[in-house]
Structure formats: structure tokens, C-alpha cells
């Protein structure tokens, strides 16, 4: 399973990338706002930092305008994935951009039917949102499993990119289900290393080692 970082924080992305943890990056207008950076400048910097796909989102509402924005974003770097919303206009833009050979990430997916349409329109990635479904008492993970099954049934090449990933449990569940990609904030990815028993065991080993009076570095 590939790990994408859901962030426009270049320093945070670089930290994870140095450990080989980054297979790609996703951004959105809210993350660009949080970064305080110009969208074209920060996206180019991220594209230069990582070799995998970097999703940059259009903001237009009409297909023709989405296509124009998408082409402009795609000029930033060859690893740009143009991010479009799962609306009828977004699907029209997806078809045109994908036919032009551009990577397209169709975002804000909340149903299997939407995911089917995105795959038929040539999406490179479909982004179902787990956490936002959980927020309204629906099962976000069930959607991931359903999309995985349907895509496998019909051999769609669109990759399932699980988004709105908020907890380490979300990541583990996506891995078990077979999501192709998860995208998560840096804090969630770093939290994958945490376990209370790891901390407890390390404390015990350190305490016992201190009692030996030894040093590994002294001959």
C-alpha cells in the first residue's frame, strides 16, 4: 500500500520523505490556505521534493474552466495529478484530462456509484473520504471495501486512494481491505509507530540497562 502525505507543509513532507515514507502527496484548497503559500509555488516545490504523484486541485465549478485550470496545474511538473471534484462537471473534466494523458484524482467520493462513474471517466485515482462518512454515522471503511470489490469485479485500473484518514486504525483497516493508497496528515503517519507496549518495553529495557553500569560505546 502506498502512503501519500495529505499536506502542503514542505518541511513536514521532507521529513517523511527522508525516511522513504512518501509515495506521493495530496493537497487541497484548505491545505494551501493553511500553508500561507502561493499554490503554484508551493506545489512546484513539493513536486521537486518527491518523485510520486502530487495532487493539485482545481477550484472552478464548470467543466471547461476545470479543464483550463487542470492543464495549467499540470504544467507545473510531470508528476502532477489534477484533482477534480466528483460532480458531473468534474467527471467531464476528468475524461478530457485523462484522454490527454494526464493523471486525474477524482475527490470527494462518498458512494460506490460515484466511484464507478469516476473509473469509467478514466480517473487515475478515486478518493473516498472515510472520516467524513464516519462523522455522519456511516461506515467509511465499508465504502472502501465496496469500491475495492467493485473495481476488482470489473478490472478497473483506477486506484483506490483512501482519504480523510484520521487514525492509525483507519490505515490498518485500509491495508487489510486492499486500498491501493492512503493519504493522511503527517501526524497520523508518524502515529503509526506508536504503541503503549513498545513504550513500556523500552522503559523496562532502559531501566535494566542502567543497572548494568555498562556503555556500548566504551571499550
UniProtKB/Swiss-Prot annotation:
Q: Which reaction does it catalyse?
A: D-sedoheptulose 7-phosphate + D-glyceraldehyde 3-phosphate = D-erythrose 4-phosphate + beta-D-fructose 6-phosphate
According to the lineage, what is the superkingdom? Bacteria
Segments crossing the lipid bilayer = none
Instruction: Give the UniProt subcellular location, in the record's own words.
Output: Cytoplasm
List the PROSITE patterns hit by this protein, alphabetically. Answer: TRANSALDOLASE_1, TRANSALDOLASE_2
User: What processes in GO biological process is this protein linked to?
Assistant: carbohydrate metabolic process; pentose-phosphate shunt
Q: According to its UniProt record, what is one Pfam family this protein matches? A: TAL_FSA
- Provide this UniProt record's keywords sorted from A to Z: Cytoplasm, Pentose shunt, Schiff base, Transferase
- Which GO-annotated molecular functions does the record name? aldehyde-lyase activity; transaldolase activity
| SUPFAM superfamilies from the UniProt entry | Aldolase
Might you give the EC number(s) for this enzyme?
2.2.1.2
Main subcellular location of this protein, as a coarse class: cytoplasm
Record-linked HAMAP family: Transaldolase_3b (MF_00494)
Known role:
Transaldolase is important for the balance of metabolites in the pentose-phosphate pathway.
Instruction: Identify its protein family.
Output: Belongs to the transaldolase family. Type 3B subfamily.
Protein's UniProt name? Probable transaldolase
What's the source species' lineage?
A: Bacteria, Pseudomonadati, Pseudomonadota, Alphaproteobacteria, Rhodobacterales
